[in-house]
């Protein structure tokens, strides 16, 4: 192998890594933004949260723990050292959302598919930038 070939392969590999990292930040940023808005809307107890609570008989305070738990999970996910734990917590939160949507038959298909897609994107963004997550899939 010539020096030129080796240099080209190294440059291509570095460019691919850079592109994957950029894509991972875009995916994680968009998902994080959506989840942050969801968390804040629960914490501010916006009208849609109040309407949902009233429709299904949930207590008025119900949206606050949801906003707090999602906010904590999101913060843990955004810290690189604890990102995997955050992804697990967010997946659990979204799994609960799926279960509630199916149980209450409220947006059972759209709501569940959307929550599932969010969970997949959380892990996909993490997989692109974290070798620990890649190692889980390659063993």
Residue ranges and their predicted role:
Residues 2-37, 79-139:
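Extended, low-polarity transmembrane helix blocks
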Residues 32, 46, 66-68, 116:
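Short hydrophobic/aromatic segments of transmembrane alpha-helices and their interfaces
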Residues 37, 58-76, 91-92:
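Core segments of alpha-helical transmembrane spans in multipass integral membrane proteins
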Residues 43-55, 70-81:
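Short juxtamembrane and helix-loop transition motifs at transmembrane-helix boundaries
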Residues 44, 58, 97-100:
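Charged, amphipathic alpha-helical interaction segments
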Residues 52-66, 111-116:
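Structural signature of hydrophobic alpha-helical transmembrane segments
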């Amino acid at each position: 192998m010539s020096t030129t070939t080796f240099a080209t392969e190294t440059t291509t590999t570095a460019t691919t890594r850079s592109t994957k990292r950029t894509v991972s930040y875009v995916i994680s940023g968009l998902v994080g933004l959506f989840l942050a808005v969801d968390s804040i809307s629960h914490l501010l107890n916006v009208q849609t949260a109040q309407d949902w609570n009233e429709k299904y008989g949930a207590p008025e305070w119900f949206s606050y723990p949801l906003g707090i738990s999602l906010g904590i999970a999101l913060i843990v996910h955004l810290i690189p050292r604890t990102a995997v734990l955050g992804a697990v917590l967010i997946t659990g939160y979204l799994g609960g959302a799926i279960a509630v949507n199916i149980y209450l038959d409220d947006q059972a298909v759209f709501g569940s598919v959307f929550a599932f897609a969010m969970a997949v994107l959380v892990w996909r963004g993490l997989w692109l930038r974290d070798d620990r997550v890649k190692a889980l899939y390659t063993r």
